[in-house]
Amino acid sequence: VASNLSEERLWHLLLHYRPTIGGGYESEADEAGFFLAANGKTDPQAELQQTIASFFSTELVGRSRQPARCAFIARYHWLKAELGIDETRLPPQSCDRFHAWLKELNPASITLIFPSAYMNNPSSMFGHLLLRVDQKNQTEQTRLLAYTVNYSADVTSDNGIVFAVLGVTGGFKGFFSTHPYYIKAREYGDFENRDIWEYRLDLSPEQIK
């Protein structure tokens, strides 16, 4: 069963696996703490098996140094549903840090935000995408306080030539960040005078969570 699950598209999405020219897989994630198996970056099955084994351990793993069930909670919920894992057989874990974070976000819906191109910056010619986590009973005014999930390049050089080469070839590392929406709205709308388009996504409560 585990072998078949390692071939599932959702498992590949969770681990950011992409097919390689040689017929294998390699994850786009570079953080060593993102993988539980030594060869997890290139072996979906090994990572799956080690992930399942880690659920039965109290060892602290990952960048956040938490038990595997809490550090990789999306993997856990998917595998629990697919394998019918009995939680009573696992070491008890409350995942307080995750639940406190989720309570702060208080997600009720997700909106896709598209700031259009910024003419003074060629690197923005295709615009940008980010997600806004909207809360229940949110108004037009309070939506500015909602959190966003953003992925962007970690620009390490202000040299124009280096910036252009690394930007076009994917030479910069990418990172996720979470900020209140008013910060991004001010950056894109007020400072750069971009048009900002919003698209409410049709997601189920489980997908939103």
Task: List each model region and its residues.
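Intrinsically disordered, low-structural-confidence terminal and linker regions
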Residues: 1-39
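Short, compositionally biased low-complexity segments
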Residues: 24-26, 46, 184-187, 206
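Structured, non-membrane catalytic/scaffold regions adjacent to prosthetic-group chemistry
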Residues: 87-92, 128-129, 141, 204-209
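Active-site-adjacent bridging/hinge elements
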Residues: 101-109, 205-209
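Active-site nucleophile-His-acid catalytic modules used for acyl/amide transfer and hydrolysis
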Residues: 185-209
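Glycine-rich catalytic cores of cysteine/serine-nucleophile enzymes that process amide/ester linkages
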Residues: 108-194
